[in-house]
């Protein structure tokens, strides 16, 4: 029989009550911590892939034959090139359908004495107190500090890359409030351990204790928001004498781009307890690395590497959780779920990280902007999980610290012994020599002539450091696991306007191209390191921006042909006509099936495919252009923080009603508006031609019809709406001019 101590039994009982899993039958003495099963749709998908591949080969034959016999060489070449890109991108998607798997973990069976649990370092990143409100950071920090996990094993590091005294003040307030919040959560087995979420819930406790805690939270929130609104921390608000001096560092010369290192221990598990002296408080450390205008800081990857070094000096926990500041913990048993994999003797040696999906709160009914990223964070993940494992998505990831120091069989030693991944820390985190070394490794020139960013830590060279780092770890031989419990492990906020969505994804497109066009390209280095299927799977993301080419060609060329009654597709009487129909229905049908099988709705899928088109005409296109200009040294790009603050009530109401929010004028809306106008004109003229001239250009008309239905929100924003979220008149006017130019140009090539 498997035996546990009384203390261990009580701790496991708490974990079991937080897992929210349905009852499962296990044999007596069964200590299996997790299981893995292949998806049932694998074989049918492989069979379909064979038939679809045959269809693509036939289509390529048709294109080549047309190219050799047709007079319109340019048009045929564009269609051929577009279909080559579409075929390649379909192949990348199919590689992720090759071996999808589902995993289940059993945290209630994780047996260890509380003192034997491994230490856990949590990294939370923020960069702007106005785009990422400090109270959001506070709630994320408190939610992980309150994990159902030995508190003395948890160390929370908050990286403030904006170097803001407002964020530091908010965390000081959080440290004081945590002494009431953490005991309350653990005594009452609270599931929602983000205070904002808990006190907004209709199911929360109304006891005197709960109401008292709520009053404390509202007082804290009021103080923090007052400080943020005023833009400075007034002396009257600093109630703890030991922290008064740290705010003197914010002098007139202090800027977000040029300032010294600030490391402040706000809570120490060795000394801090709640008022009843029954509960130990976890470590809470504020870190703002040194910045200089003459030194490269490598954006978020640089901030994470600083935390990796600072935590290595202070606590050096073997497990690291990375979180964005808006991604609060939604399940207090999450660390134990990760341990089911990270401590399994069968796989732990080569396991680099356990990735949880990103889940977003407040998503509209049918996810109008496709911000749940269902394919990115769920569908593709189970496909990757059957290969080398899921890619890293920037947050909600438990890392094996050893994974940042070379391949499983090839440890790369850091430049100083204090940063070795297996070192046991034997000094208090607030010891003078420990803090001195922590300040040193957070310096802006510390990484010069070291392996940081190239062979050690998070990797530099791409704006999407999460994708690039996970990819490089897989290339080195590390594996990963996708953990998707029924209760979401983490929840966050998503953009609520189209301009925020496409701006964020333009940055992703640029970063992914930086990987695709590099010495570590997935199609070459990736295939060599991980094998054909996994390497091609990584191309699904690296080549994101390439979607823009076929979308532009198919968004304009057939429609212009329709306006001039010049055929670019086979007519309905031609047998090749049906090949286009079958390939289109097959690709879209399989995409719909993927979506629905993973719990999506039909309306959600429709919006998802529409946003795929919108991205192709905006973020992917402009990302490709900006990357090209940067490669030619004609421009540079930086890292723009996506705003998580949403105080516009009217915008929120429109979002809930699923009305598109275009917002301010942006050049990224020009191609989108132009393609909407061109397709509407082509649809009207093609419909007239169908009745006036008989057979008509059916495929061209069907394509224009499909585009018009997808563009209905754009027509509404152009003509019918008068609210602030409508398309700006300037965009509509310029798009009208571009439409005229395209139609006139079409006469040259199509007549």
UniProtKB/Swiss-Prot annotation:
Transmembrane segment boundaries: 47-67, 72-92, 543-563, 577-597, 617-639, 674-694, 697-717, 731-751
Functional description taken from the UniProt entry: Thought to be a Golgi-localized beta-glycan synthase that polymerize the backbones of noncellulosic polysaccharides (hemicelluloses) of plant cell wall.
Gene this chain is encoded by: CSLG3
Family (UniProt): Belongs to the glycosyltransferase 2 family. Plant cellulose synthase-like G subfamily.
GO biological process: cell wall organization; cellulose biosynthetic process
A cellular component term, taken from the record's GO annotations: Golgi membrane
Principal location class: Golgi
Catalytic residue positions: 161, 466
SUPFAM superfamilies: Nucleotide-diphospho-sugar transferases
Keywords: Cell wall biogenesis/degradation, Glycosyltransferase, Golgi apparatus, Membrane, Transferase, Transmembrane, Transmembrane helix
EC numbers for this chain: 2.4.1.-
Protein name (database record): Cellulose synthase-like protein G3
Nucleotidyltransferase as UniProt keyword: no
GO MF, one annotated term: cellulose synthase (UDP-forming) activity
Membrane topology according to the record: Multi-pass membrane protein
Record localization: Golgi apparatus membrane
Superkingdom to which the source organism belongs: Eukaryota
